[in-house]
């Protein structure tokens, strides 16, 4: 797996202060010819871009997430769910074990129905699902944590427990 960046102090992707891992690569099935119009991270579309995820990278992320002011670890892309999920599951398990009380968020261009049965979802707390659609772009407070109005913020734990899609509470226009 290749990564583009680790943002160790972000307030843009989730409530509070987050550590964000940007992975490289996405498959063309979610976007027009693999090139989403208006893509926020065009360089992240190529699997060959960036640097290798290594044990040192994992250590760097864990040390960043351990900081007392960090609330959340966020997976962004590219497309996190088009990566080696075993590597990501291992990373998330380590975060859950070593960094208690940290939420895990995942941004994906897939719909909930496409990803709910993936093993990695057992370790994710919140998923922002759905492809970015340029014509529905909305970065206002009314569309918090999403890039376009079609995207939804899913409470993954409750959704898996109740075996139905449960939207994260407190997010306007989220159903």
Can you annotate each of these PLM segments?
Residues 1-3:
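Extreme N-terminal starter segment of soluble prokaryotic enzymes
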Residues 11-55:
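Canonical Radical SAM [4Fe-4S] cluster-binding loop centered on the CxxxCxxC motif
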Residues 19, 73, 104-106, 129:
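Hydrophobic faces of well-ordered beta-strands that scaffold small-molecule active sites
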Residues 34, 68, 122:
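Structured loop/turn residues at beta-strand edges in well-structured enzyme cores
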Residues 45-60, 82-121, 126:
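Canonical radical SAM enzyme core domain
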Residues 69-94, 143, 157:
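Conserved glycine-rich "GG(E/T)P / GGGxP" loop and the immediately following alpha-helix
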Residues 77, 108-110, 130-132:
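Short secondary-structure boundary segments
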Residues 121, 126-175:
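Classical nucleotidyltransferase
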